Amino acid sequence: MQAKAVTPRPASTILLLRDATGTDEIEVFMMVRHYEIDFNSGALVFPGGSVDKGDQEIIARPELYSGGEGLDASALSFRIAAIRETFEESGILLARPHGSDALIDAKRAGEIEAAHRAALCDGKTTFLKVIIENGLLLALDELVPYAHWITPEGMPKRFDTWFFLAAAPPEQAGAHDGKESTDSIWVSPREALAGGESGRFKLPFPTTRNLIKLGKQTSVKAALDDGGGKPIVTVMPVMTKLNGGRQLRIPLEAGYDGEIFEVGTA
């Protein structure tokens, strides 16, 4: 009997960036997934997660976000979910006070986190309520589309994921939630990839490819400029088994320095 096709679930993730001190490198905020989670358990990943119905409710309130001009409902939902999930998973909040051009500072972000993050993660409040009660404007314009990956066909759990770049708000350091993730770190792409090679970190294939791509940039500005100047090519890897090993094929034009990659034994 042929397995029922699994429809990919819309999801978003943000690569939060800051310039490393004393080096020509950037650092990205990453977290270790809890080992009991059924997708990417134990993996080092960027903060993110699924689009939910609450994100759709925010779309209908354009006075609650900036940077939505010219975007359809789908594009808006991916961006709103990216900011919400990043706040839930890291405490970092990409938002402005109403009437201000500046992102909220670390002190205000900490107050909002202390008051609402746990309740939001537990489903006891909504992101819409958090935004309204704190007079916030979600900074969708801070997000730079970077990549679009869809889990291969045939997998039991599939995601249709947009990756965004964003400069981390000044002094917002971030921290894992202790539930879905058990550790967090600001790390250069070089260090993260070295950890994957040594076995210190478990890196999913899309994470590895995006870290390699990101590691070519020497500053946050360079990364944002580079990401904002290129078309996004959707990547849905195709897996093949050959001589006891596995290969993943992705579009060469997606910009990951190759088309066929060895990913371990079959």
Locate each region found by the language model.
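N-terminal leader/linker segments that precede catalytic domains of diphosphate-processing enzymes
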Residues: 1-266
